Amino acid sequence: MTWIPLHCHSQYSVLDAMSSIKDFVAKGQEFGIPALALTDHGNLYGAVDFYKECTQKGIQPIIGCECYIAPGSRFDKKKEKRSRAAHHLILLCKNEQGYRNLCILTSLAFTEGFYYFPRIDKDLLRQYSEGLICLSGCLSSSVSDAALKSPEALLLELQWFQDLFKDDYFTEVQLHKMSEESIAGFKEEWLKQEYYSLIEKQIKVNTAVLEASKRLGIPTVATNDIHYINANDWQAHEILLNVQSGETVRIAKQNTHIPNPKRKVYRSREYYFKSPAQMAELFKDIPEVISNTLEVAKRCDFTFDFSKKHYPIYVPESLKTLNSYTEEDRYQASAVFLKQLAEEALPKKYSSEVLAHIAKKFPHRDPIDIVKERMDMEMAIIIPKGMCDYLLIVWDIIHWAKANGIPVGPGRGSGAGSVLLFLLGITEIEPIRFDLFFERFINPERLSYPDIDIDICMAGRERVINYAIERHGKDNVAQIITFGTMKAKMAVKDVGRTLDMALSKVNHIAKHIPDLNTTLSKALETDPDLHQLYINDAESAQVIDMALCLEGSIRNTGVHAAGVIICGDQLTNHIPICISKDSTMITTQYSMKPVESVGMLKVDLLGLKTLTSINIAMSAIEKKTGQSLAMATLPLDDATTFSLLHQGKTMGIFQMESKGMQELAKNLRPDLFEEIIAMGALYRPGPMDMIPSFINRKHGKEIIEYDHPLMESILKETYGIMVYQEQVMQIAGALASYSLGEGDVLRRAMGKKDFQQMEQEREKFCKRACNNGIDPELATVIFDKMEKFAAYGFNKSHAAAYGLITYTTAYLKANYPKEWLAALLTCDSDDIEKIGKLIREAQSMGIPILPPHINVSSNHFVATDEGIRFAMGAIKGIGRGLIESIVEERDHHGPYESIRDFIQRSDLKKVSKKSIESLIDAGCFDCFDSNRDLLLASVEPLYEAIAKDKKEAASGVMTFFTLGAMDRKNEVPICLPKDIPTRSKKELLKKEKELLGIYLTEHPMDTVRDHLSRLSVVLAGEFENLPHGSVVRTVFIIDKVTTKISSKAQKKFAVLRVSDGIDSYELPIWPDMYEEQQELLEEDRLIYAILVLDKRSDSLRISCRWMKDLSIVNENIIYECDQAFDRIKNQVQKMSFTMSTSGKETKAKGNKPNENGHTQALAPVTLSLDLNELRHSHLCILKKIVQKHPGSRTLVLVFTQDNERVASMSPDDAYFVCEDIEELRQELVTADLPVRVITV
């Protein structure tokens, strides 16, 4: 008998069900089920993916939802238990009207009814029931509640739904009955009783519902409330539930684990995808409940029409005065308007200077004719493809943003290849000059719509989105939902935490997963250590097994960083919407690909902070010099800019801040804008290997060769190296007579590795090339090179547009360094680490950072003749409104003359005593009196007197004193306290740092600054330039001490937050050193430390080996520090090694130093290796094992043969092991190596 599952959950029932769409549909196919329903909790998140997967597998998809229905009104949100906030109800789409109504219902559930859950109510059901089939629901339904109350209540509830849905209402029965063997698997008596209670309730409800349904003539269906695929998935599902709840599924007790009674748990283990035979057996006494499911499926006939678009239209002003017009007239008017905009912009965008560059490329033609030809060609493609509306909608958004002072980027993606977009102001880089192709943007050989991605100033993005909402209607615009999934490492950590596994052990497993793109199964295949751990350790195996089940599960929802959907009419006519978590932001329920596939227009509006920085800098420059700069009109041959790049001073330059980019800039020494474009395209995995050759060819150190003379003009600007995707298109055209459109099809095929199409293209390319007189063998060689290149080739249009941003930031830094760094400091004012780097960069350029000043500072950092003035907006606790009132008063009535004048002129409703005190402690009033304690003491009496004076003046009361005061400006009498508390310099600086995030006017280290050179101190900013294993001397202030207990050894250790005046970082102090030098670990203490730098992993790890209090510095202290440094440096040099038999330098992945501590006096660890049995493979395994246990103990290798010691070696290259070697010893035994530990 055929059974159709009608009540099924996927992982889109977030952290409640674990079935992936793919596995769910595959299981249905395995069972030979002709139709499947998806009914996730309260949403349609997975509907499109489910539909596509089903149709691909030949299964009828039924789109549905298990809705939450409020017991009363959806607007009633009284504080009551979560379990009472809503009942459950299944709704299935019969047809398109049903789908539309389900979209509306699930949308309103979020936007109007959300309370614990997205809820609808009976009022909404009355309005939007057409086209829907309703099932009564599970034990959490209102029908089940009524069945447990009384027969009368049940009849009333059923009649309400029957009256509404008529023949499309079905009651639902479920029975999650377990076998006796399975019941015996319950370890807890309370859970067993919960199970019996569940079954008792289900039987009671089923009996009542069947009887009442029969009486009312309502058909009944059997469902199983599927939450996972296989019967043995119940444990992984329980873990998933408690990832959500935050509970552990078990708790430690003595030396074992017991189940956690507080955990979230299903009372039966039968919520899996059962076969039709199993369901038929379960309901063998009432077979009609099985057959009725097929009847439901037959009634459902909804299909998505993926060919239909629901794009908005653009109505030109010329039509808005007309009473009526046809769609054809409207589109024609849009096309005319588009062309009109382009033609009007032609003289402005194509100035004589821009045309001169085009003339250089085409010396025998009028450049304006070339531009017009290109424009006409683009229009001839865009208009017939129906894309005018799209371009005008994007133009409208960008035009509004620019008109309202919101900076917009020069372009992003392939759109920069369009002359039309350049004329419309959508992009700002002229494409003909830089060989950027329209066909890379819109391919005339293909029907697909292009993407126009827009970068917008971060600060103005929300305003732009609000404009789109206002322009197109709030019901027609939404942002796009995203789904965060459990990657392998996250799955391991979630499972480990939920199983209450030791954190160190969880981290040990997780560290074997190298990156976000590596799956757990791949890691098991490729990492022998992880595989051994899985085989030999039961607890680790359990974590890995459960993580394998949960990997890929949806963990949370979010909002797409850029995507905005604009619909031609109300969104809910086509898709469901929701409200993003913890906000009022409307988002689609479908993620990016599904939402586009159902015909929604996506516009990418990406907030780019660099544009904000550019805008702030250019505004400051104009205010100072009167010169108005614009990205599009900067000279692209500025010598000062290129000189800056030659020096590698790329800090603060867009996409060039990394050390690798600094080196590339220094070595390449770019002197053309085209080379900046190439740098951005080259510095990526893949093409990065070509960088040395690119540099050498530029500087004449390597011969530039071309496979064919026709390729020279194409590859000349990149020194004979293929860098851009557009070059593939050009080569195909030059050698094989491809049109640019055909070349783009070839590029796509290569990029997608479509082997079938590639063979067709290979044959086509070689045949055409041969027809053009090219040797067949050479044609094949060139095609192979193109194919290999296409795997990493970059979009030149995008590289050029972003290259312009890079150049602009370099230009500003080179020519207006104070204004540029001030802008960067403003935009990064909430990032203390970035502030430190920028301050260090400013100081390296001879630009001082000045403390905040009440008469100079504003919300932003400000460039002045003397340096960069610290921003009031970066002072903790000082809000924008207060700053605006201070600056406005200052601008209107002149500088403040004293603290008294400031308070007198301030709106005391906005300016509190506390905020004035913060401004004083931040240094804003040092210009009036450097004694901050005296200024603080004056605030209370001044504030009270002036406030009283203002109050009396406002009420019209004039005392004898205030009358006189009106003629004597700012002389309201005050009385200062006799004993003004005086803080130490250390306390003053500590308060300043608390407010500014950094020490600014002075630093506690200034007391030892003169001794730093004698101590050979290296500050944190230089750490990244030093090699792995470096032993460094440094000085810092302890800002914060956090004491912790190591999970394994149960010993105290500390994590220090330290700073050296510019940079701050964390420094772990492990147990042994903590015990020895605990008394030094106090906040605000000045410390000299000897550190070892570990750069074996992607991030820098720092090990502290010695510390000394520097509150007093004398010759003896300096001598002691020097001696300690020499001693530790010698120890570290002895501890490093190279595996001589491997012939390669060890480059192990770094591991966090052992919690048990680093000291300089620990005994070495000696390993004995038997040469009679030793193999190279043994050494490789030994190397891996040793690398996994780094620490501070010297490692000595003793080689024996025939029980005789024949050689020994001490490691070099910073190689040493942890103090507690028990794990190391055990791992050596497990690995079955001819190695034994002979001394510890």
Curated annotation (Swiss-Prot):
Its EC number is 2.7.7.7. It catalyses: DNA(n) + a 2'-deoxyribonucleoside 5'-triphosphate = DNA(n+1) + diphosphate. It comes from the Bacteria. SMART domains: POLIIIAc. CDD domains: PHP_PolIIIA_DnaE3. GO terms for biological process: DNA replication. Disulfide bonds: none annotated. GO terms for molecular function: 3'-5' exonuclease activity; DNA-directed DNA polymerase activity. It is found in: Cytoplasm. The keyword NAD does not apply. Keywords: Cytoplasm, DNA replication, DNA-directed DNA polymerase, Nucleotidyltransferase, Transferase. Coiled coil: none annotated. Its main location: cytoplasm. GO terms for cellular component: cytoplasm. SUPFAM superfamilies: PHP domain-like, RuvA domain 2-like. DNA polymerase III is a complex, multichain enzyme responsible for most of the replicative synthesis in bacteria. This DNA polymerase also exhibits 3' to 5' exonuclease activity. The alpha chain is the DNA polymerase. Belongs to the DNA polymerase type-C family. DnaE subfamily. DNA polymerase III contains a core (composed of alpha, epsilon and theta chains) that associates with a tau subunit. This core dimerizes to form the PolIII' complex. PolIII' associates with the gamma complex (composed of gamma, delta, delta', psi and chi chains) and with the beta chain to form the complete DNA polymerase III complex. PANTHER family: DNA POLYMERASE III SUBUNIT ALPHA. This is DNA polymerase III subunit alpha.
